[in-house]
Amino acid sequence: MNYWHSAIATFGIGDTVTTIIGLSMAGIYEANPAANTILGELGLFGIIAAKVLYFGLMYIIVKSMPEHSRKYGPITITVLGTLICLWNIAIIATQVLGF
């Protein structure tokens, strides 16, 4: 099984899409200082470039690990991406529902 697909789907695409949706709504801002700086300086292109760079770096690191351990890199990214997506969705839902 290629664990990178789920990592890209959650952290790469899911986080990016939910962030874009959230930031398009009044009252929602980027809480991550690094991402906020990148967004302010380079916009959406900067976020996508940072994610591509991050995935490239993680891929190199994972490839240098023993083969039996390689799946844990993308699995960790998938868990992180899932949690971030759920957080973003909760923030968006809170704004939409007026909580």
Swiss-Prot record:
In Swiss-Prot or TrEMBL terms, this protein is called Putative transmembrane protein ORF13
Q: Report the transmembrane regions from the record.
A: 8-28, 42-62, 73-93
Report the main location listed first in the record: host cell
* Gene Ontology, cellular component aspect: host cell membrane; membrane
**Which cysteines are cross-linked by disulfides?**
none
Species this protein is from: His1 virus (isolate Australia/Victoria) (His1V)
Under InterPro entries, the record lists: DUF5658 (IPR043717)
Q: Which UniProt keywords apply?
A: Host membrane, Membrane, Transmembrane, Transmembrane helix
Family annotation (Pfam families): DUF5658
Q: Where in the cell is it found?
A: Host membrane
How does this protein lie in the membrane?
Multi-pass membrane protein
